[in-house]
Amino acid sequence: LESNDLLLNSSQKICAQTNDLTPPCPPVNFKISDQYSCDYYFFDKSCDEKDFENRIEWSSVDEECFLDTKFFNIYFSDNGYNNFDNIATTSNNYFVHKNLTNLKGAYFITALDRSGNESIPSDTIRRDNCPKYLLPNVFTPNGDGKNDFFTPFYTDGSITNFNYGNCPRFVRSVNISIVDRTGKQVFSHDSEEDTLNGIYINWDGKNSSGKELPSDTYYYIATVTFDVLNLDESVKEIKGWVQILR
């Protein structure tokens, strides 16, 4: 080497990233998927369905925030109001919450950037169960094995063209009193006491003494308790009539 040549030592050079402490934008347009609305979701679900799922969707605010976002944290509360748990982390803009015993609960999400900074929470959305309990207005207790009992709309899958949207859903208990035209009680049922028939009643058209009642119109008042978050919707009084045809 010539005496005036220089040697450059790069051994002390340090490569570093800027310490990013700025959290990303929170996700927006957070909602339950339209395909998971009560009517749509239960359109083809059997009356005995016990395995449920929710799908939630969202988007970022703008392109800059989207590029700064790497993951999303999903938080869930089964009581719908507090005690939220982080149940998943995903890079998608949707999440399917599977293996649920019911639909009710609440969700919020946060965004995570590449440095691990977490955004403020999104809006919280609540998902409630889809309560349903419908009673027919006629039954024929003649022992032919068809429509012999007064029971809510239900099928084990053997009825063709059955509307599964009418299945009893998320019912805790049923208490019903049935009277004749004079107002005399001819039958009563409490699902919490008669656990064999439960919410299905299965009235055979006989009075409380076991005597067959004549073909006629009878009137009922039923108090139905549902498994829902909304307490205003948890207890419903259903009044109606049913005709016995023999």
Language-model features: locations:
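Beta-sandwich strand segments
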Residues: 4-11, 117-122, 228-237
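Beta-strand-rich modules
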Residues: 1-9, 96-118
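Short, solvent-exposed loop/edge segments of extracellular or virion-exposed proteins
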Residues: 29-41, 138-141
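Conserved aromatic anchor
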Residues: 42-67
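Proline-centered linker/hinge motifs at extracellular inter-domain junctions
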Residues: 22-28
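Recognizes extended acidic, P/S/T-rich segments that occur
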Residues: 68-102, 194-196
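Extracellular Ig-like/FN3 beta-sandwich strand-entry sites
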Residues: 69, 102-106, 171, 215-217
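Short loop/turn motifs at secondary-structure boundaries
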Residues: 25, 47, 51, 126-246
